[in-house]
């Protein structure tokens, strides 16, 4: 579970102070949560604060049973290694390593040994000896998903994971994420500007100008292949 209580976050540039998160409180019980909002609404900053990549100016954040807002930088780094994983719009694969070694690197960082299973789970077993430059964009993103899940995280954070992909490839990547989330039971929190993806989520959080404007639950989430794009 993830819980935030009265979170504020601002950035300072010279004499200019910009409030990005304004008194955010929320609970995410599990399943797939989608955070929606226009550019500049604060959704990516919220993801960073919930995951421990950044600290709030004030307020409390609990993620995977630990109060990360009270941790030192070193403790938060250790928390991220142990408990959470990330998938971004950019793949951040090491070009000199094969698919297999890129995924193994994620597993090794967390002391896990299930990297081979994750390569099969994202249907890249036949390409495990290939290098990132030999893969399509969708395949590279699947490698980044496998690398993240090879850590066996309690929470997977995704920031615009299909932003650089075409519709067909994007749907397939989202389908992988949803299927693996259901099979493995981790919590997934995804930031996206694609409002149609609200239909596939268990929980939807809408943001506007640094505040939560709406939160609701879907009783029967749809397949990504049943919605618009």
Give short role names for the model-derived ranges.
Residues 51:
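Helix-to-loop junction immediately C-terminal to a conserved catalytic motif
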Residues 59-67, 105:
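Conserved ABC transporter NBD signature motif
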Residues 67, 112-127:
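Conserved ABC ATPase "signature" region
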Residues 68-85, 221-226:
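ABC ATPase NBD coupling module
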Residues 131-141:
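Conserved ABC ATPase signature
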Residues 150-154:
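A short, proline-enriched helix->beta-strand linker immediately N-terminal to the Walker B motif
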Residues 156-159:
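Catalytic Walker B motif of ABC-type/P-loop ATPase nucleotide-binding domains
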